[in-house]
Amino acid sequence: MPLFSTDKFQIEIERNWKNIYNISETVIPPDEREVAAMIDQIMEYNKKFVENKGYEPFLTSKYPDKKLAILTCMDTRLIELLPAALGIKNGDAKIIKNAGGTMVHPYGSVVRSLLVGILELGVEEVMVIGHTDCGVQGMDGKEMLELLEKRGIDKQHIDIVRHSGIDLENWLGGFESVESSVHETVKGLKE
Protein backbone atom coordinates (compact mmCIF):
# COMPACT_ATOMS: atom_id res chain seq x y z
CA MET A 1 0.00 0.00 0.00
CA PRO A 2 1.36 3.47 -0.83
CA LEU A 3 2.95 5.50 1.92
CA PHE A 4 0.23 8.14 2.17
CA SER A 5 -2.99 6.24 1.60
CA THR A 6 -5.86 6.84 4.02
CA ASP A 7 -8.35 4.49 5.53
CA LYS A 8 -12.05 5.18 5.18
CA PHE A 9 -12.65 3.02 8.27
CA GLN A 10 -10.82 5.55 10.45
CA ILE A 11 -12.97 8.35 9.07
CA GLU A 12 -16.12 6.36 9.87
CA ILE A 13 -14.91 5.86 13.43
CA GLU A 14 -14.42 9.60 13.78
CA ARG A 15 -17.83 10.33 12.30
CA ASN A 16 -19.44 7.98 14.83
CA TRP A 17 -17.36 9.15 17.78
CA LYS A 18 -20.26 11.11 19.25
CA ASN A 19 -22.41 7.98 19.31
CA ILE A 20 -19.74 5.88 20.97
CA TYR A 21 -19.20 8.36 23.79
CA ASN A 22 -22.81 9.59 24.07
CA ILE A 23 -21.86 13.18 23.39
CA SER A 24 -24.60 15.62 22.56
CA GLU A 25 -25.14 17.00 19.07
CA THR A 26 -23.43 20.28 20.03
CA VAL A 27 -20.01 18.65 19.59
CA ILE A 28 -20.69 18.01 15.91
CA PRO A 29 -21.06 21.05 13.64
CA PRO A 30 -24.69 21.83 12.74
CA ASP A 31 -24.39 20.68 9.15
CA GLU A 32 -22.83 17.23 9.12
CA ARG A 33 -23.08 17.21 5.33
CA GLU A 34 -20.44 19.95 5.17
CA VAL A 35 -18.14 17.91 7.38
CA ALA A 36 -18.75 14.75 5.36
CA ALA A 37 -18.13 16.66 2.12
CA MET A 38 -14.88 18.07 3.48
CA ILE A 39 -13.67 14.61 4.52
CA ASP A 40 -14.68 13.20 1.14
CA GLN A 41 -12.71 15.99 -0.60
CA ILE A 42 -9.65 15.25 1.51
CA MET A 43 -9.88 11.54 0.80
CA GLU A 44 -10.38 12.12 -2.94
CA TYR A 45 -7.36 14.44 -3.00
CA ASN A 46 -5.34 11.81 -1.16
CA LYS A 47 -6.40 9.10 -3.60
CA LYS A 48 -5.18 11.21 -6.55
CA PHE A 49 -2.03 12.18 -4.64
CA VAL A 50 -1.16 8.50 -4.19
CA GLU A 51 -2.14 7.55 -7.76
CA ASN A 52 0.07 10.34 -9.15
CA LYS A 53 2.90 9.44 -6.76
CA GLY A 54 2.87 12.96 -5.36
CA TYR A 55 4.61 11.65 -2.27
CA GLU A 56 7.84 10.77 -4.08
CA PRO A 57 9.55 14.18 -3.56
CA PHE A 58 8.95 13.77 0.18
CA LEU A 59 10.41 10.28 0.58
CA THR A 60 13.06 10.05 3.27
CA SER A 61 14.12 7.60 5.94
CA LYS A 62 12.54 7.44 9.36
CA TYR A 63 15.82 8.66 10.87
CA PRO A 64 16.08 12.46 11.19
CA ASP A 65 19.01 13.80 9.16
CA LYS A 66 19.80 16.50 11.73
CA LYS A 67 19.34 14.06 14.65
CA LEU A 68 16.86 16.57 16.06
CA ALA A 69 13.49 16.35 17.78
CA ILE A 70 11.30 19.42 18.22
CA LEU A 71 8.48 19.70 20.74
CA THR A 72 6.17 22.52 19.75
CA CYS A 73 2.56 23.66 19.68
CA MET A 74 -0.13 22.23 17.41
CA ASP A 75 -1.09 25.77 16.32
CA THR A 76 -2.14 25.81 12.67
CA ARG A 77 0.05 28.84 11.99
CA LEU A 78 3.15 26.75 12.65
CA ILE A 79 2.55 24.03 10.06
CA GLU A 80 4.72 25.69 7.40
CA LEU A 81 6.08 28.62 9.38
CA LEU A 82 8.14 26.69 11.91
CA PRO A 83 10.17 24.59 9.44
CA ALA A 84 10.70 27.69 7.27
CA ALA A 85 11.83 29.75 10.26
CA LEU A 86 14.31 27.05 11.30
CA GLY A 87 15.58 26.16 7.84
CA ILE A 88 14.56 22.53 8.20
CA LYS A 89 13.02 20.37 5.53
CA ASN A 90 11.21 17.05 5.33
CA GLY A 91 13.41 14.37 6.89
CA ASP A 92 15.51 16.71 9.04
CA ALA A 93 13.69 16.37 12.38
CA LYS A 94 11.03 14.60 14.39
CA ILE A 95 8.34 17.16 15.20
CA ILE A 96 6.09 16.43 18.17
CA LYS A 97 3.08 18.70 18.50
CA ASN A 98 0.50 19.15 21.21
CA ALA A 99 -1.56 21.93 22.75
CA GLY A 100 0.98 24.47 23.97
CA GLY A 101 4.07 22.42 23.15
CA THR A 102 4.29 21.26 26.75
CA MET A 103 5.03 18.12 28.71
CA VAL A 104 2.03 17.62 30.98
CA HIS A 105 3.04 14.29 32.52
CA PRO A 106 6.37 12.45 32.74
CA TYR A 107 4.72 9.25 31.48
CA GLY A 108 2.67 10.90 28.74
CA SER A 109 2.91 10.73 24.97
CA VAL A 110 5.47 13.55 24.71
CA VAL A 111 8.08 11.74 26.77
CA ARG A 112 7.26 8.45 25.07
CA SER A 113 7.72 10.03 21.64
CA LEU A 114 11.00 11.63 22.65
CA LEU A 115 12.28 8.35 24.09
CA VAL A 116 11.44 6.53 20.86
CA GLY A 117 13.21 9.27 18.92
CA ILE A 118 16.31 9.12 21.12
CA LEU A 119 16.55 5.37 21.70
CA GLU A 120 15.34 4.06 18.33
CA LEU A 121 15.67 6.80 15.74
CA GLY A 122 18.99 8.50 16.46
CA VAL A 123 17.79 11.78 17.96
CA GLU A 124 20.62 13.53 19.81
CA GLU A 125 19.18 17.01 20.38
CA VAL A 126 15.74 18.12 21.60
CA MET A 127 14.36 21.62 21.08
CA VAL A 128 11.28 22.96 22.89
CA ILE A 129 9.73 25.81 20.92
CA GLY A 130 6.90 28.04 22.08
CA HIS A 131 5.25 30.85 20.14
CA THR A 132 3.49 34.15 20.70
CA ASP A 133 -0.30 34.32 20.94
CA CYS A 134 -0.58 30.67 22.02
CA GLY A 135 -4.15 29.58 22.71
CA VAL A 136 -3.06 27.58 25.76
CA GLN A 137 -1.62 30.64 27.47
CA GLY A 138 -4.02 31.69 30.21
CA MET A 139 -6.33 28.72 29.68
CA ASP A 140 -8.34 27.93 32.82
CA GLY A 141 -8.85 24.25 33.68
CA LYS A 142 -12.06 24.90 35.59
CA GLU A 143 -13.54 26.77 32.61
CA MET A 144 -12.50 23.91 30.31
CA LEU A 145 -14.38 21.44 32.52
CA GLU A 146 -17.45 23.68 32.40
CA LEU A 147 -17.20 23.73 28.60
CA LEU A 148 -17.00 19.93 28.54
CA GLU A 149 -20.18 19.71 30.60
CA LYS A 150 -21.92 22.24 28.33
CA ARG A 151 -20.90 20.05 25.38
CA GLY A 152 -22.67 17.09 26.95
CA ILE A 153 -19.93 15.28 28.85
CA ASP A 154 -21.63 13.69 31.84
CA LYS A 155 -20.41 15.14 35.15
CA GLN A 156 -20.36 11.60 36.50
CA HIS A 157 -17.65 10.69 33.98
CA ILE A 158 -15.64 13.73 35.01
CA ASP A 159 -15.99 12.73 38.67
CA ILE A 160 -14.81 9.18 37.90
CA VAL A 161 -11.64 10.58 36.34
CA ARG A 162 -11.14 12.92 39.31
CA HIS A 163 -11.56 10.06 41.80
CA SER A 164 -8.96 8.02 39.92
CA GLY A 165 -6.37 10.59 40.95
CA ILE A 166 -6.26 12.85 37.89
CA ASP A 167 -6.13 16.58 38.59
CA LEU A 168 -8.30 17.62 35.66
CA GLU A 169 -8.13 21.34 36.38
CA ASN A 170 -4.34 21.21 36.19
CA TRP A 171 -4.32 18.84 33.20
CA LEU A 172 -6.69 21.09 31.23
CA GLY A 173 -5.12 24.31 32.45
CA GLY A 174 -2.71 26.43 30.48
CA PHE A 175 0.33 28.45 31.40
CA GLU A 176 0.94 32.09 32.26
CA SER A 177 3.79 32.89 29.90
CA VAL A 178 5.31 31.15 26.90
CA GLU A 179 8.84 31.70 28.22
CA SER A 180 8.12 30.11 31.60
CA SER A 181 6.27 27.24 29.90
CA VAL A 182 9.27 26.46 27.69
CA HIS A 183 11.62 26.64 30.70
CA GLU A 184 9.35 24.38 32.78
CA THR A 185 9.03 21.87 29.96
CA VAL A 186 12.81 21.75 29.43
CA LYS A 187 13.32 21.37 33.18
CA GLY A 188 10.76 18.55 33.32
CA LEU A 189 12.35 16.73 30.40
CA LYS A 190 15.80 16.95 32.00
CA GLU A 191 14.51 15.47 35.24
Where are these regions (language model features)?
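Short glycine-rich anion-binding loops that position phosphate/pyrophosphate groups of nucleotides
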Residues: D75-T76, T132-C134
